[in-house]
Amino acid sequence: MKQALRVAFGFLMLWAAVLHAEVRIEITQGVDSARPIGVVPFKWAGPGAAPEDIGGIVAADLRNSGKFNPLDRSRLPQQPATAQEVQPTAWSALGIDAVIVGLVTPNPDGSYNVAYQLVDTGGAPGTVLAQNSYKVNKQWLRYAGHTASDEVFEKLTGIKGAFRTRIAYVVQTNGGQFPYELRVSDYDGYNQFVVHRSPQPLMSPAWSPDGSKLAYVTFESGRSALVIQTLANGAVRQVASFPRHNGAPAFSPDGTKLAFALSKTGSLNLYVMDLASGQIRQITDGRSNNTEPTWFPDSQTLAFTSDQAGRPQVYKMNINGGAAQRITWEGSQNQDADVSSDGKFMVMVSSNNGQQHIAKQDLVTGGVQVLSSTFLDETPSLAPNGTMVIYSSSQGMGSVLNLVSTDGRFKARLPATDGQVKSPAWSPYL
């Protein structure tokens, strides 16, 4: 946790939170079918009101995962603060087989101790399944809550939690000197800050695998350019500013390469830069347009969009040579893929019968499942644990961010009131 705190502290030191309206998750479908769980409000052991509702943060995280349905506080049969106070039968009678309790204690130095316990109320009643405590300053109380959520989520599902991650996105506001902003927030929309403001469009943010940098497209020079910005100090490195189009950056999982699309020779083609040397290699060639690269876990293979068969479809290709292989066959066109960190599936924008939705394709069987039901969906980005997808869609006259679970059962919106929100990118684990 200390390493993650240092990374996040670097963000806080350089940018104050945005005063504009932040995005917030609004669940639209699926929580009722999820596993019920009890999350008791964490007991506050200090004077006055608690500085943060840690239990509420944990409950929201678990609900937002789409895999849990925390019991409403008005229905809690008791409000214990420790495992010893939990009465398992009171919870099991409500179909609850696990309960989270906790305690927040102020320290003389101004810090806080946050402690939680995950208690079995089903198979082995009263057994403590997981527990931990953290000493944090006030600004890290939400982070402590997300940490507890990550640990509980992994204990109960076997899947690493992704509640301490962030999302990057572009907001286009109405008017002002800098109507385009690249922003970053916690995955749930809290702690939003601005990375870059521009009078011209910003596009396609992409995270480095260590979460320390963002690559993106800017038009501030009058034409498109690819840059990489270091979040800790704001330093900007220009990667590509060739004639015509420079776009669609994607860091390799090993952090040594950046793939992107250029049209300096006419058609769009894929290129890969070695980030240490700055050397650029052309990967695809020909008259077709090849763009929107995404990496497989081996850092040697790309999935990408190509119109070589007429309509856009997703192909894959080794960057060291060989022919491109088409991997999408369902629907009239498929594009803008994002491959999961284990390489077992990808999500993409799939169009069929005039509808444009987010779909998931199993890369072993080829099976395709449509996940979203919103309008003109685009730019899907997977959570690092592969359980959720964030994407943008059209709503009214603007665009908003949406979440959908990769099993398609859970859906939520992240609306913002101060502009159009698009081009989301989910961070790696931080």
From Swiss-Prot:
Leader sequence range is 1-21
Q: Where in the cell is it found?
A: Periplasm
- The organism sits in which domain of life? Bacteria
The cross-references to Pfam families, in alphabetical order and at most eight, read:
PD40, TolB_N
Q: Which UniProt keywords apply?
A: Cell cycle, Cell division, Periplasm, Signal
What GO biological process terms does the UniProt entry carry, in alphabetical order?
cell division; protein import
A GO cellular component annotated for this chain's UniProt record is: periplasmic space
Q: Family per UniProt?
A: Belongs to the TolB family.
> What is known about what this protein does?
Part of the Tol-Pal system, which plays a role in outer membrane invagination during cell division and is important for maintaining outer membrane integrity. TolB occupies a key intermediary position in the Tol-Pal system because it communicates directly with both membrane-embedded components, Pal in the outer membrane and TolA in the inner membrane.
Q: Which NCBIfam families match?
A: propeller_TolB
Q: How does it assemble?
A: The Tol-Pal system is composed of five core proteins: the inner membrane proteins TolA, TolQ and TolR, the periplasmic protein TolB and the outer membrane protein Pal. They form a network linking the inner and outer membranes and the peptidoglycan layer.
The protein's name is Tol-Pal system protein TolB
Organism (species): Salmonella typhi
